[in-house]
């Protein structure tokens, strides 16, 4: 089991619980498949221990002999807790019946107006820009359950949906400015703020530009107007991820003055994906600063990411035990301020130089210890 598998397990467990809590046909959970059963084993079992405000839950799912089984009683208990705590409750409809003895009042699930935490899983294939143009407008008011819909568990970012949502909020803001010139749409304002904060210095505006033929996402970078497709892959992937997450937070927090301060759990597999080393170094601090109350669980192989996290972040290294072949999780010391070479050598068991260069350096040290300076100089010249 590797780091990606751990994120997959979290997603399999959370998605089933949230699907049951929401009772929404558009929120779907994945099932354990045969590929999830280790070769040579008869079953795969995954378990979640959950604690919230003193309430403890223990839920498991497993795959055995081609069947999917789970702890249904515990699923009901934890999903009912989440439903009543954050979503709403089932209420009886108030109807008049001709015969009260034979008619049973119907119950309907009714959402409350409280904020809800978000949960999103972003996989390695999360960003796929199929088109840069918008041809279908966002329609309809979004209920807070929309924060849990639209591939929240699927690992991918619905980029087109984000564009449509952004355009819809921008058009709404423009309409209210007819009567109130300086009015702002809180949801749009929060998303813009999140994206610009994450992109950092040099970016001053983001909006949808509409012409007679199409509509495009436009950013202002160093006073230059650029279409989305003109940005680097790193900039586009940051906009896609931050835009999707901030959109969900804006929908999930109708009563919060700053939706970016909403709560939630976000899983990101290979956070350094498609990012230049400069972006690898700044992406995690940018996410932390933009979304201060989100618990991020991320995987990475990038030393630049590891050296950027502070002492408040728990770094865990996965490695296989030589005797039991079990995958062990080992807490690591904070690596903020460490140089990349040290992280590669001490934590990733990787040589800084290639094998040929390493052998030359070792031989140079041998010659120096033997005071064979002429021979050492010849090898140094080979490295020059």
Where are these regions (language model features)?
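Extended helical coiled-coil dimerization/tether regions that scaffold
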Residues: 143-261, 376
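Short polybasic amphipathic segments
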Residues: 42-50, 73-76, 215-222, 315-317, ...
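Solvent-exposed, amphipathic alpha-helical segments
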Residues: 13, 165-169, 248, 360-367
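Switch/communication elements of ASCE P-loop NTPase nucleotide-binding domains
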Residues: 1-26, 214-352
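Acidic, Mg2+-coordinating catalytic modules of nucleic-acid enzymes
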Residues: 332-384
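A structural signal for short, well-ordered beta-strand segments and their strand-loop junctions
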Residues: 120-123, 205-210, 218, 298, ...
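Amphipathic alpha-helical segments that form well-ordered structural scaffolds
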Residues: 9, 45, 121, 190-198, ...
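P-loop NTPase switch/coupling surface
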Residues: 1-161
């Amino acid at each position: 089991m590797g780091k990606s598998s751990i994120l997959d397990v979290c997603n399999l467990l959370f998605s089933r619980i949230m699907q049951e809590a929401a009772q929404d046909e558009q929120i779907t959970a994945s099932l354990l498949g045969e590929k999830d059963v280790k070769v040579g084993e008869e079953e795969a079992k995954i378990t979640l221990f959950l604690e919230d405000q003193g309430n403890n839950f223990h839920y498991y799912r497993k795959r055995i002999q081609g069947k999917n089984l789970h702890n249904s009683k515990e699923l009901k208990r934890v999903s009912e807790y989440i439903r009543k705590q954050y979503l709403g409750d089932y209420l009886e409809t108030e109807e008049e019946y001709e015969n009260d003895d034979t008619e049973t009042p119907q119950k309907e699930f009714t959402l409350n107006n409280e904020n809800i935490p978000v949960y999103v899983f972003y996989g390695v294939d999360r960003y796929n820009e199929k088109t840069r143009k918008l041809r279908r407008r966002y329609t309809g008011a979004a209920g807070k359950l929309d924060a849990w819909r639209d591939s929240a568990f699927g690992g991918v970012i619905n980029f087109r949906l984000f564009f449509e949502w952004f355009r819809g909020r921008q058009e709404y803001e423009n309409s209210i400015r007819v009567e109130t010139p300086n009015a702002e749409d809180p949801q749009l304002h929060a998303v813009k703020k999140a994206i610009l904060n994450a992109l950092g210095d040099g970016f001053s505006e983001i909006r949808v530009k509409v012409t007679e033929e199409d509509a495009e996402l436009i950013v202002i970078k160093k006073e230059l107007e650029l279409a989305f497709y003109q940005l680097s892959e790193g900039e586009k992937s940051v906009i896609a991820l931050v835009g999707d997450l901030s959109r969900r937070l804006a929908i999930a927090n109708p009563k919060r003055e700053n939706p970016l301060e909403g709560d939630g759990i976000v899983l990101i597999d290979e956070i350094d994906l498609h990012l230049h080393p400069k972006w690898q170094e700044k992406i995690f601090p940018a996410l932390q600063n933009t979304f201060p109350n989100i618990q991020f669980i991320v995987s990475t192989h990038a030393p630049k990411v590891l050296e950027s996290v502070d002492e408040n972040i728990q770094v865990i290294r996965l490695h296989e035990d030589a005797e039991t072949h079990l995958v062990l999780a080992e807490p690591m010391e904070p690596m903020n301020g460490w140089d990349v070479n040290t992280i590669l050598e001490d934590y990733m068991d990787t040589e800084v130089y290639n094998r040929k260069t390493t052998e030359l350096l070792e031989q140079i040290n041998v010659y120096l210890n033997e005071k064979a300076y002429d021979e050492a100089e010849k090898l140094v010249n080979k490295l020059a």
